[in-house]
């Protein structure tokens, strides 16, 4: 196996604190050869990192987003095997047209990665507004529900194999009273509910649940003190490229026996432990 090691520096809350992260890439350039993949919310953050990884592994990718300038910049960086479509994830009426356009660009869709989502970071149950609640549930849950429904109708109607990958969150594994966590928890339930229904029809459905990752969505958390590291097993923010490696595996044929799984990418922070001591060391 060809293993390429990249060393990256992940910034923590304080500039003086740095951590070195080693990433290993296996079968570089071949594991997704010929795959046609759509990534929603693919212009930045985890979505962009996934698109970049997929292309480097041989796939052709369509990314979506609402800001055309961001999409153009992303495609310029991603290269010739990338394309973009302007699509608002909450535009339920435009879903079938969106999938039709993606099919025309790629010649078909093998995998759909439902990554687009928002968080308003209310911080407290009492701060949640009806407008904010609806906005997050519509974008994170309702849109993904009906996009996946249309995609399954499309694939099953043609007797085609394929896969779907949802990007949820480690917060979905915990009791949560905020709209973001509620919506991601519901997505986990959707993945588990659908997966067994379609596996024998040649379609796999899984999810990855990242911990707090170094993206635009977590800018607020990055202003926190080093106390954050006490709440995370990793003691740092995760990197989008780390999440992308896992996503690549789940879309590849190497994971053909994996279906209906919520794979937490948070170094184990979601795990429940006895006691209240947050020191994870021995």
Question: Which stretches of residues belong to each language-model region?
Answer:
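Conserved glycine-rich cofactor-binding loop
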Residues: 36, 43-45
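Short C-terminal tail/terminal secondary-structure segment
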Residues: 4, 17-26, 259-282
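C-terminal substrate-recognition "lid" of short-chain dehydrogenase/reductases
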Residues: 236-265, 270-271
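Short, small/polar-rich loop/turn modules that mediate ligand/substrate recognition or access, typified
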Residues: 199, 204, 258-260
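Rossmann-fold cofactor-recognition segment
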Residues: 78-93
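Catalytic loop of short-chain dehydrogenase/reductase
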Residues: 163-200, 212
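Substrate-binding pocket helix/loop in short-chain dehydrogenase/reductase
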Residues: 123-125, 129-137, 228
């Amino acid at each position: 196996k060809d293993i390429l090691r990249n060393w990256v520096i992940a910034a923590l809350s304080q500039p003086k604190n740095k951590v070195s992260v080693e990433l290993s890439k296996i079968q570089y350039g071949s594991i997704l050869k010929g795959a046609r993949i759509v990534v929603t919310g693919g212009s930045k953050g985890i979505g962009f990192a996934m698109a970049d990884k997929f292309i480097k592994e041989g796939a052709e990718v369509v990314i979506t987003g609402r800001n055309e300038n961001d999409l153009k910049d992303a495609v310029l960086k991603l290269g010739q095997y990338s394309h973009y479509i302007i699509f608002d994830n909450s535009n339920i009426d435009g879903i079938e047209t969106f999938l039709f356009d993606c099919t025309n660009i790629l010649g078909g869709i093998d995998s759909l990665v439902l990554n687009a989502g928002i968080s308003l970071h209310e911080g407290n149950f009492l701060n949640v507004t009806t407008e904010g609640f609806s906005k997050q549930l519509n974008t994170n849950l309702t849109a993904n529900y009906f996009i996946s429904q249309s995609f399954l109708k499309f694939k099953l109607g043609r007797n085609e194999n394929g896969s779907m990958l949802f990007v949820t969150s480690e917060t979905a594994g915990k009791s949560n009273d905020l709209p973001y966590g509620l919506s991601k928890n519901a997505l986990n339930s959707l993945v588990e509910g659908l997966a067994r229904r379609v596996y024998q029809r040649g379609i796999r459905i899984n999810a990855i649940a990242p911990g707090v990752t170094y993206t635009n969505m977590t800018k607020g958390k990055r202003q926190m003190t080093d106390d954050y590291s006490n709440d995370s097993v990793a003691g740092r923010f995760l990197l989008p490229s780390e999440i992308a490696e896992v996503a690549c595996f789940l879309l590849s044929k190497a994971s053909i026996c994996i279906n209906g799984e919520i794979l937490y990418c948070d170094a184990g922070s979601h795990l429940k432990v006895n006691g209240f001591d947050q020191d994870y060391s021995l």
